Amino acid sequence: ETDGEIVACIAYRTFAPGVAEMKRLYVKPAHRGRHLGRILAETIINITRERGFDKIILDTMVEMKAAQQLYHQLGFYMIPPYDDQDPERIVCYEKQLQAKFHVKIVAA
């Protein structure tokens, strides 16, 4: 929010057990270039991790190159469509939130 105007938004939903889906990341054009998208995405990643999700998924339009670059920088990787998305128009991403291994320390 800037001067009472909402300039950016983001949401997430539970997609499946252990899987969050990032939704609706949007920054108004006049406010782009100020890292608001990155801040919002990092916030959702941290919230979903703290809430115990194992991974977070999202989709974006093929032409949204800046968004795709941001997702790569945040550690997302491309995955096949997961919810009847049109692969000609939509690119899907995933990021692991929880470590998939456990460390056991044994005294010698």
Predicted regions: what they are:
Residues 42-45, 49, 61, 68:
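Residues within alpha-helical segments
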